[in-house]
């Protein structure tokens, strides 16, 4: 495994370089780290019309958070049963 990323530190470093928007794509560990670091402002989530079973993690895995982050649905598109959603932090 590679070195761990500290989300809050990475966001600050990129902001110091003048970056005002970030797009992160990854798995449950990266998303969980972003949530725990309290640096997630927006979430784009795709829901597929398929079900499977197994022991996979939740959408976000990692450190616990004291209070859940609240988001508001800002847009939703449907195509062939797939839902493309966008949420913004409230």
Task: Give the location of each predicted region.
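Enzymes that bind and transform nitrogen-containing heteroaromatic metabolites
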Residues: 1-90
């Amino acid at each position: 495994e590679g070195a761990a990323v500290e989300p809050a530190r990475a966001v600050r470093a990129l902001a110091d370089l003048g970056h005002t928007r970030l797009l992160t794509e990854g798995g449950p560990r990266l998303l969980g780290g972003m949530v725990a670091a309290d640096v997630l402002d927006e979430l784009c989530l795709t829901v597929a019309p398929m079900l499977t079973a197994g022991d996979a993690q939740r959408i976000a895995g990692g450190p616990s958070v004291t209070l859940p982050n609240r988001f508001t649905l800002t847009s939703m598109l449907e195509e062939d049963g797939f839902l493309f959603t966008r949420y913004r932090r409230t």
